[in-house]
């Protein structure tokens, strides 16, 4: 029996207005519909994104596009680098969780 290709889900997260780490985590919490107990730090982000990535592996793969990231990168500096590392870690471990960057 031939394997059928799963449809892809997509999500776009606009980071163009993000100027602080707190605003970044608030934007992520809203975009991904994280639970109320999301504590707005990198460990919590990794845990919540891993949960989403596992679901993407079991159901439809997910492509997340971060729009306006250049402004957030300038505003957040090394905090943005740490945020991006978390995303890279999750997407490397779960190939059905794809991250794209759009200026």
Where are the regions that the model predicts?
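Positively charged, polar, low-complexity stretches
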Residues: 2-103
């Amino acid at each position: 029996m031939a394997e059928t290709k799963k449809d892809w889900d997509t999500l776009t997260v606009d980071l163009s207005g993000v100027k602080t780490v707190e605003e970044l985590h608030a934007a992520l919490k809203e975009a991904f519909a994280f639970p109320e107990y999301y504590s707005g730090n990198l460990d919590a982000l990794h845990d919540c994104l891993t949960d989403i990535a596992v679901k993407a592996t079991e159901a439809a793969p997910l492509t997340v596009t971060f729009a306006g990231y250049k402004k957030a990168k300038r505003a957040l500096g090394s905090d943005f680098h740490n945020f991006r590392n978390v995303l890279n870690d999750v997407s490397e471990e779960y190939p059905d969780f794809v991250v794209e960057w759009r200026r």
